């Protein structure tokens, strides 16, 4: 309930939360199946942050032209690109409708098993890359002195540079009861 502004984890307005939970509990007691979807999570090595349902962000402590990071991004040990940017995020399909979308990343249907690498204020304007959830994204970060690694906008840690951070699918998923079961009903919030 209300974990973001446009993302799909806030399918219920706070004013409707009690009524929605009561309806779902009544359906459960009646033996009706609940609309449950498994959510992939992202795990990080190279920085101490919690697994993420939406995205992992690696960014400069301050954003803007004065503090870009030098990023080398490999996917499964193959070079994807080198660039200078304010940061980079790796988002799940569910997270593609949140911060990723605000950074001009693609919107991915939540049933598609994918993750997306989106650069933040990329100086060379590289497009985002959609990857399978089996991929491991290695991000070598260089910059003035440090970077911040953030999981779902909630847990963060500062890392000294240079540092390599790897983002990959976590071994377990999270079950989500979806009171708005159809993806396109939730898209109305993006208009």
Tell me what each language-model feature is.
Residues 1-2, 111:
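Short hydrophobic/aromatic-enriched beta-strand-loop microsegments
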Residues 4-9, 108, 124-125, 174:
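Short gly/pro/ser/thr-enriched loop/turn and capping motifs at secondary-structure boundaries
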Residues 44, 73, 95, 149-150:
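Short aromatic-centered micro-motifs
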Residues 2, 56, 153:
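A residue-level signal for conserved active-site and pocket-lining positions in enzyme catalytic cores
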Residues 75-76, 125-191:
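ATP/nucleoside-binding phosphotransfer catalytic cores, i.e., glycine-rich phosphate-binding loops
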Residues 38-40, 52, 65-69, 84-86, ...:
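A generic structural signal for well-ordered coil/turn residues at beta-strand boundaries
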Residues 6-79, 85:
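Catalytic core of DAGKc-family lipid kinases
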Residues 81-125:
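Gly/Ser/Thr-rich active-site loops/lids in small-molecule metabolic enzymes
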């Amino acid at each position: 309930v209300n974990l973001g502004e446009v993302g799909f984890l806030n399918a219920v307005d706070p004013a409707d939360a009690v009524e929605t939970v009561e309806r779902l509990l009544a359906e459960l007691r009646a033996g009706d199946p609940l609309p449950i979807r498994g959510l992939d999570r992202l795990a990080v090595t190279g920085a101490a942050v919690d697994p993420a349902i939406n995205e992992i962000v690696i960014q400069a402590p301050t954003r803007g032209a004065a503090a870009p990071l030098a990023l080398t991004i490999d996917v499964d040990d193959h070079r994807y690109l080198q660039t200078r940017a304010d940061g980079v995020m790796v988002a799940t399909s569910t997270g593609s409708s949140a911060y990723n979308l605000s950074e001009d990343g693609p919107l991915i249907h939540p049933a598609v098993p994918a993750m997306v690498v989106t650069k933040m204020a990329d100086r060379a304007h590289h497009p985002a890359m959609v990857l399978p959830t089996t991929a491991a994204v290695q991000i070598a970060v260089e910059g003035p002195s440090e970077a911040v690694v953030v999981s779902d906008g909630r847990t963060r840690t500062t890392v000294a540079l240079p540092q390599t951070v790897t983002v990959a699918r976590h071994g377990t998923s999270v079950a989500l009861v979806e009171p708005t079961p159809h993806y396109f009903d939730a898209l109305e919030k993006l208009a």
